[in-house]
Amino acid sequence: MKINGFTLLEMLLVLTISFTLITLTIFPISSTLSTLREKQLLEEIKASIYYAQINAVATNQDTFISFGPTKNQLITYTNSKTLVIIPLSQTLTLTQPKIGNFRFSSTDGSINRFSTIHLTSSTNNYKLIFQIGKGRFRIEQN
């Protein structure tokens, strides 16, 4: 005789279905979060490079970008102060042993040399490509 209640079998069935659905949704969320962290860091790198270029023209000082493979970070600075430091260690890794500095000219914001910088994550490889001339760059996913 059942009066306004559920049997143990019905409760176990509902709990099993609920836990199965929860488990199936957690794994895609974790991979989505790591992808979002990568994209956010790449956008932050883009923004800091644009900021360095704009700062060079606005303050009439040469601005430098330095990628440090040993500390795995990006630093933008002028002769007098550090503008931005972005640590890459949690999400992206620089794969080249020596990269060097890039300089944005104070007259027109052009960059002094062209190069490709390789970044790797747990799932993707990226190339940060600096083009010679007006300081243009792009990020490509391999």
Language model: regions and residue ranges:
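N-terminal single-pass transmembrane signal-anchor helix
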Residues: 1-29
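Membrane-proximal amphipathic alpha-helices
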Residues: 34-45
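Phosphate-interacting basic helix/loop segments used at nucleotide- and nucleic-acid interfaces
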Residues: 46-51
